[in-house]
């Protein structure tokens, strides 16, 4: 997938809207003046005059629309690393115990030698020991913003008749992490989010959030394998999640497993027997099926 970003004037904007009128789509982004989708390419015209084309046929559509491609601010494939990028990722969403850690990191091309020397890669490919060694070095060197939503707070916010669901809470966290990083004066050429939902669904939930920024977003599945900025965020977030999991375990006197398998069921049942439901409200995501499985284990 390619992303083209251009700056166009009012006359060209008016002409573009006329050309793409039959392909208009809705956008929840308050900074988008016009949105369309043609030939699998999403076209976003921002109120600032910035035009973004996202999709494998971006170049072809730009030529079809007679857009000034030569004036492209940047043209980047999913694995482009030659521009300053903010990348965000989250860890903990699939684990019963522990909170959710979301990190947004800013990586400039000048950081690449340092990152490659450390062996930065997707956190899922690295051992926890390696992550715990690398993460502090990254935190010191790379501008980033970390957020941790504790299990207790998660249970207050996520679920039936509550403000968020499992998708919208991640939208809120990613948006806030990126917003706070941009507030520090960071100026990326691209912002990449490890895709966990569609762009349209992301923008739908984003409309409910208080803080917004005008920068266009790139959504990429398995982005941590394509962008160093996302890989950095993946590592820092994983370390933050592990630290939180360890601290929660120390508080309760139990070693809490990562993930949502049978080991989590067993420990959860032990916590229920020792402390009652309040211990799971403090340490786990209650809406997971593990809660009912743990309760069932107590009756055996």
From Swiss-Prot:
It is found in: Cytoplasm. Its cofactor is Mn(2+); Mg(2+). GO terms for cellular component: cytoplasm; ribonuclease H2 complex. Manganese or magnesium. Binds 1 divalent metal ion per monomer in the absence of substrate. May bind a second metal ion after substrate binding. It catalyses: Endonucleolytic cleavage to 5'-phosphomonoester. A divalent metal cation binds at residues 89-90, 194. The keyword Nucleotidyltransferase does not apply. The keyword Ribosomal protein does not apply. One of its GO terms (molecular function) is RNA binding. Its EC number is 3.1.26.4. It is an enzyme of class 3 (hydrolase). GO terms for biological process: DNA replication, removal of RNA primer; mismatch repair. Residues 83-300 form the RNase H type-2 domain. Keywords: Cytoplasm, Endonuclease, Hydrolase, Magnesium, Metal-binding, Nuclease. Endonuclease that specifically degrades the RNA of RNA-DNA hybrids. This is Ribonuclease HIII.
């Amino acid at each position: 997938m390619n992303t083209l970003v251009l700056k166009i004037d009012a006359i060209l904007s008016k002409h573009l809207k006329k050309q793409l009128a039959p392909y208009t789509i809705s956008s929840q982004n308050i900074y988008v003046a016009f949105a369309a989708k043609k030939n699998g390419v999403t076209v976003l015209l921002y109120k600032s005059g910035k035009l973004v084309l996202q999709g494998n046929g971006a170049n072809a559509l730009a030529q079809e629309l007679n857009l000034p491609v030569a004036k492209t601010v940047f043209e980047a494939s999913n694995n482009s690393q030659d521009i300053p990028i903010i990348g965000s990722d989250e860890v903990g969403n699939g684990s019963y115990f522990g909170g959710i850690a979301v990190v947004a990191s800013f990586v400039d091309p000048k950081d690449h030698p340092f990152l490659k020397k450390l062996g930065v890669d997707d956190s899922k490919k690295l051992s926890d020991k390696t992550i715990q060694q690398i993460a502090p070095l990254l935190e010191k060197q790379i501008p980033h913003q970390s957020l941790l939503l504790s299990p207790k707070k998660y249970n207050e916010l996520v679920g039936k008749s509550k403000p968020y669901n499992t998708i919208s809470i991640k939208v809120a966290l990613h948006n806030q992490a990126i917003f706070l990083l941009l507030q520090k004066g960071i100026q990326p050429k691209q912002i990449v989010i490890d895709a966990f939902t569609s762009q349209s669904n992301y923008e739908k939930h984003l409309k409910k959030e208080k803080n917004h920024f005008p920068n266009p977003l790139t959504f990429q599945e398995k982005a941590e394998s394509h962008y160093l900025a996302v890989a950095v965020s993946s590592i820092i977030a994983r370390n933050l999640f592990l630290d939180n999991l360890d601290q929660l375990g120390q508080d309760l006197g139990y070693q809490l497993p990562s993930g949502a398998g049978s080991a989590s069921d067993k420990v959860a049942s032990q916590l229920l027997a020792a402390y009652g439901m309040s211990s799971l409200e403090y340490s786990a995501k209650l809406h997971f099926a593990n809660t009912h499985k743990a309760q069932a284990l107590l009756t055996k």
